[in-house]
UniProtKB/Swiss-Prot annotation:
Annotated gene: pyrB
Name of the featured protein: Aspartate carbamoyltransferase catalytic subunit
Subunit structure of this chain's protein: Heterododecamer (2C3:3R2) of six catalytic PyrB chains organized as two trimers (C3), and six regulatory PyrI chains organized as three dimers (R2).
UniProt KW keywords: Pyrimidine biosynthesis, Transferase
A biological process from GO: 'de novo' UMP biosynthetic process
Gene Ontology cellular component annotations, sorted alphabetically: cytosol
EC number: 2.1.3.2
Physiological role: Catalyzes the condensation of carbamoyl phosphate and aspartate to form carbamoyl aspartate and inorganic phosphate, the committed step in the de novo pyrimidine nucleotide biosynthesis pathway.
PROSITE patterns: CARBAMOYLTRANSFERASE
Keyword Glycoprotein: no
Organism: Pseudomonas fluorescens (strain Pf0-1)
Residues annotated to bind L-aspartate: K99, R184, R239
NCBIfam families for the chain: asp_carb_tr, PRK00856.1
Superkingdom of this protein's organism: Bacteria
């Protein structure tokens, strides 16, 4: 379980500003806090009668999703529209990609149409980095999820949710529960929590759904729900990603729910003001009980709302960083 992006900060320009948003690995705490603060300021836009600001007017954002998505794709579309960008969403199932066109050829054709930014979701880990290295450097690349590797905007919207409900990270205990092995969300959340100073990060899963080397993320590993949930402030549930599983990692979904499903009884072991989160889609009766998903501890729908603001922040900051980099290069070329 080695991070793909521990070398040079490809995501940043020469001034240390966001240029692409590929992963949370290697990003400093100050930058993550800036993203959260910027998103906080954008939450007010969603309450307006006219939900628009002109920050990306005249810019074109292309959403290119090679995997199915509802929340991520829709919230990226809304985020770009609220920033006044022109938005194109490529339906990969009806595009030339379904006829054998390569990922790079698809994006280069879109690039030739003068797109300013690509939001890409792909099933291969490292796809976003590959695109950022090979597409025109003036085009910002935002990772909407790549394989098992990373889902940085989901990680940041989860951090915004925690901060708005808990005030900060320095004294929190956070448990991430479920299919850790196949979850890009788990990786992004572990990185973000560690960077933002959370002192107690726990992962709870059966041994077959824990990746090798997970200890490098500075987490405590539990294989018992009762023990792992004791006195936690935040529970982040993850779905079973059957589409990524090979072999008999689990006896059955029913057995998983019996041992690792979040029920009202199990949640009673957490702190009384604990919040429950889930990136979606929810599988009720598999990883979470309906009474918990719809109950007073749940902030799952808040996550969706905060997701729009986080994606507005990332889109605007990456576009600003690209513009600053071009100005820097022009000045130094004179």
């Amino acid at each position: 379980m080695t991070p793909l992006d521990t070398k040079r900060p490809l995501q940043l320009n020469d001034q240390g500003q966001l240029r692409h948003f590929l992963s949370l690995d290697g990003l400093r705490r100050e930058l993550l806090t800036e993203i959260l603060d910027t998103a906080d300021s954008f939450l007010e836009v969603g309450a307006r009668a006219v939900k628009k600001v002109p920050l990306l007017r005249g810019k074109t954002v292309c959403n290119v999703f090679f995997e199915n998505s509802t929340r991520t794709r829709t919230t990226f579309e809304l985020a770009a529209q609220r920033l006044s960008a022109d938005v194109i969403t490529l339906n990969v199932s009806t595009s030339s990609a379904s006829k054998g066109e390569t990922l790079l050829d698809t994006l280069r054709n879109l690039e030739a149409m003068a797109a300013d930014m690509f939001v890409v979701r792909h099933g291969d880990s490292g796809a976003a980095h590959f695109i950022a290295e090979h597409v025109c450097p003036q085009v910002a690349i935002i990772n909407g999820g790549d394989g098992r590797h990373a889902h940085p905007t989901q990680g940041m919207l989860d951090m915004l949710t925690i901060r708005r409900h808990k005030g900060g990270f320095e004294n929190l205990s956070v448990a991430i529960v479920g299919d850790i092995l196949h979850s890009r969300v788990a990786r992004s959340n572990m990185l973000a929590l560690k960077t933002l100073g959370c002192p107690d990060i726990r992962v709870i899963a059966p041994k077959t759904l824990l990746p090798i080397g997970i200890e490098q993320y500075g987490v405590k590993v539990y294989t018992d729900m009762t023990e792992g949930l004791k006195d936690v402030d935040v529970v982040i549930m993850l779905r079973l990603q059957r589409e990524r599983m090979t072999g008999g990692l689990l006896p059955s979904e029913g057995e998983f729910y019996r041992l690792f499903g979040l029920t009202t009884a199990r949640l009673a072991g957490a702190k009384p003001d604990c919040i429950v989160m889930h990136p979606g889609p929810i599988n009720r009766g598999v990883e979470i009980e309906s009474a918990v998903a719809d109950g007073p501890h749940s902030v799952i729908l808040n996550q969706v709302t905060y997701g729009i603001a986080i994606r507005m922040a990332v889109l605007s900051m990456a576009m600003s960083g690209q513009t600053a980099q071009r100005q820097f290069e022009q000045e130094n070329a004179q």
